[in-house]
């Protein structure tokens, strides 16, 4: 797509290609003399595809194609396409991003948001970028970025499935060194903070790396990956069964993580996300009717304990910004290595949503954006999530989660991390 200020470069490139074609004898001098630089029309900045809605239109078209509707059918017109999008929620997503978009942000800052109805897979809101005409890549469904600590929830589920209780005690000192296939793997907490002996509830609340890595080793990295897959992270997202998998070194799409957390909100029922709910022909006959595709991925007991732990992230941990919602919330912040991405994935019983911040270059940090020394999942992403949910849930009843099942009991069982503590420098 033509970008303002590139006219001279485009003209030079035109002449360069033309001269090369003459040298290759694909054009004669006479033919080339008749060829003039084409007039470049200004880029369209308005119309049906402008703004965030262009990403939704393209996403709907892609889903229709997967459902078997060919381009000719869509171009002829006359079809009535109904989607799962909730008008109030969709506008809330756009408004929330606009309200908390960091001032003086770099041009390549990307924000994706997806909200899903737990238990059905209906996509209620989707924000894929500020302007489709500026950039066609959908930051909610196509862009990828490291998931950070949002993946710790998968290790917690694997632990609960193996009977490891939330009351179990672990060493939260920092840094520690663990074994990774015979090689030393040094793990530090955010800010290199040490926490001493704490239970899994506190480890979740504080997002303690030096506890979740040995937890993942204890339950088996393969099982952590298996939980992620069952929750909704697709096979297309590469996940290596190594100790680092619990720290979210994999790079999913925002919709993938939103769907996984929707599984948690639905008490273990995984659904396939979808946008198109019905297609009517020109005669109003039903050409397609969506049916939610669901399956039981986890037990209610495991989900009850997971949610209980993730509530602590909100009530006294890294996701405290969501307290402003004034409803029961469970969720997890996520900040990847070197602050290359920042996430907030959380849910109420009615809606699960994920918000992610990242840049085009995965090696570039978010630090400094919005005047923050360190942009984390608990900052802008959590604020956007909370603002979105306030409007999306307006008028909806306040609902709570099931009570914890207390898998494995309430005794503070001391677990051996297997890590070797390194002296702080």
Sequence positions of predicted segments:
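A penicillin-recognizing enzyme superfamily signal
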Residues: 83-104, 113-115, 126, 132-138, ...
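Conserved catalytic neighborhood of penicillin-recognizing serine enzymes
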Residues: 48-52, 164-224, 270, 281-312, ...
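Second-shell loop/turn segments in exported
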Residues: 1-8, 17-18, 22, 42-51, ...
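Glycine-rich, acidic and aromatic/proline-enriched surface loops and short helix-turn segments
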Residues: 1, 59-66, 115-130, 160-164, ...
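Primarily short, surface-exposed interaction patches in extracytoplasmic proteins
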Residues: 133, 219-257, 285-288
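Non-catalytic, structured segments within soluble enzyme domains
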Residues: 1-84, 91, 226-230, 235-238, ...
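Extracytoplasmic/secreted proteins, especially bacterial periplasmic and envelope-associated proteins
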Residues: 5, 9-22, 51, 55, ...
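Acidic/histidine-enriched alpha-helical segments
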Residues: 8-12, 23-42, 110-116, 171-176, ...
């Amino acid at each position: 797509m033509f970008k303002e200020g590139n006219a001279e470069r485009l003209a030079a490139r035109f002449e360069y290609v033309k001269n090369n074609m003459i040298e290759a004898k694909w054009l004669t001098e006479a033919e080339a003399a008749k060829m003039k630089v084409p007039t470049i029309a200004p880029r369209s900045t308005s119309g049906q595809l402008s703004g965030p809605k262009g990403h939704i239109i393209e996403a709907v078209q892609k889903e229709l194609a997967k459902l078997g509707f060919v381009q000719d059918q869509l171009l002829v017109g006359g079809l009535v396409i109904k989607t799962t999008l909730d008008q109030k929620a969709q506008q809330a997503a756009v408004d929330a991003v606009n309200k908390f978009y960091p001032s003086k942000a770099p041009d390549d800052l990307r924000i994706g948001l997806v909200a899903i109805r737990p238990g059905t897979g209906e996509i209620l809101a989707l924000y894929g970028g500020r302007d489709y005409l500026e950039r066609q890549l959908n930051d909610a469904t196509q862009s990828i970025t490291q998931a950070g600590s949002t993946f710790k929830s998968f290790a917690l589920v694997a632990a609960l499935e193996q009977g490891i209780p939330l009351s179990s005690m672990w060493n939260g000192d920092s840094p520690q060194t663990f074994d990774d296939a015979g090689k030393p793997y040094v793990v530090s907490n955010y800010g290199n903070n040490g926490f001493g002996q704490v239970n899994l509830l506190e480890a979740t609340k504080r997002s303690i790396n030096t506890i979740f890595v040995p937890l993942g080793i204890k339950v088996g990295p393969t099982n952590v990956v298996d939980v992620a897959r069952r929750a909704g992270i697709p096979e297309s997202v590469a996940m290596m069964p190594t100790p680092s998998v619990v720290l979210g070194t994999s790079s999913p799409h925002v919709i993938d993580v939103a769907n996984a957390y929707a599984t948690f909100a639905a008490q273990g029922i995984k659904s396939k996300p979808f946008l198109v709910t019905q297609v009517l022909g020109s005669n109003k006959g039903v050409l397609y009717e969506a049916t939610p595709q669901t399956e039981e991925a986890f037990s209610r007991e495991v989900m009850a304990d997971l949610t209980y732990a993730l509530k602590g992230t909100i009530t006294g941990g890294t996701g405290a910004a969501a307290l402003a919602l004034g409803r029961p919330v469970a969720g997890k912040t996520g900040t990847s290595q070197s602050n290359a991405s920042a996430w907030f994935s959380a849910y109420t019983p009615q809606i699960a949503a994920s918000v992610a911040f990242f840049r085009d270059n995965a090696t570039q940090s978010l630090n400094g954006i919005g005047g923050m020394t360190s942009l984390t999942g608990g900052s802008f992403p959590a604020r956007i999530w909370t603002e979105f949910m306030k409007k999306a849930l307006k008028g909806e009843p306040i609902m709570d989660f099931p009570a914890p099942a207390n898998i494995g009991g309430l005794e503070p069982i001391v677990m051996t991390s297997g890590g070797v503590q390194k002296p702080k420098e």
